[in-house]
Amino acid sequence: MLIPWQDLSPETLENLIESFVLREGTDYGEHERTLEQKVADVKRQLQCGEAVLVWSELHETVNIMPRSQFRE
């Protein structure tokens, strides 16, 4: 089930994004990015619709994924 990111408080959204970024592991790119930069990138992706917040009833968890990978 999709969760509209706009319905979350700014603090809750920030915490969800930080948790997601920290779970994603190490960035092996040419330049290391700060947590703040990664959080800003994910927030931008949510705002422009490239990424979505998804609630899993089975696992009772929230995840962030590319919109193209989401299937209802």
From Swiss-Prot:
Span of the signal peptide: none
Top-level taxon in the UniProt lineage: Bacteria
A Pfam family matched in the record: UPF0270
InterPro entries the record matches: UPF0270, YehU-like_sf
NCBIfam families according to UniProt: PRK04966.1
Entry similarity comment: Belongs to the UPF0270 family.
Protein name from the UniProt record: UPF0270 protein YheU
Species whose genome carries this gene: Escherichia coli O139:H28 (strain E24377A / ETEC)
Gene that this polypeptide is encoded by: yheU
